[in-house]
Amino acid sequence: MDRQDMLRVIGEGYAARVRGDVEGVLDVFTSDAQFKLNAVPQKAPVSLRTEGTNALRQAMTQLVQTFEFQKLDIIDAVVEGSKAAIRIRIMVRSKQTGNVAETESLDLVEFRDGKIASYTQFFDTAVAEQLLMPTAIKMI
């Protein structure tokens, strides 16, 4: 799998996430894929680790029900062998509070047999916490 193929698969997964299409997201993952969102659980209750299609479906369904990705852009991508590091910018809206924020994340992706076998996302827990707060405090 070359760089272009890997970025195409990653892009398909991101596009499905923006659409809120859980099954479309699952289509780019292997059946035993590991999926991790790394965050401090006390600050952002979306920290999670899953393995396999059923666990990923449950987690992704919960994420789609909680956070709407209004826009997602790939800023940088580094591909080496079967691995990729992707920096993305996301406009996110909390479906619980209506709060909106723009943030960036770093996604580490590993491929096997043309699909994502491991996906780890690092994101700003302060932004996630702000999105989930019932009333956001604005600093002046």
Q: At which residue positions do the language-model features occur?
A:
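Hydrophobic alpha-helical core bundles mediating ligand binding, dimerization, or RNAP-core interactions
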Residues: 10, 14-17, 29, 60-63, ...
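Phosphate-binding glycine-rich loops and adjacent basic patches that engage nucleotide phosphates
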Residues: 17-27, 49-50, 68-72, 92
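A beta-strand edge to alpha-helix "cap/lid" segment located at domain peripheries
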Residues: 1-5, 64-140
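Hydrophobic pocket/interface hotspot
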Residues: 13, 25, 33, 52, ...
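A solvent-exposed, acidic/Ser-Thr-rich amphipathic alpha-helical stretch
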Residues: 3, 30-81
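Short, low-complexity N-terminal intrinsically disordered segments enriched in polar/charged residues
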Residues: 1-31, 137-140
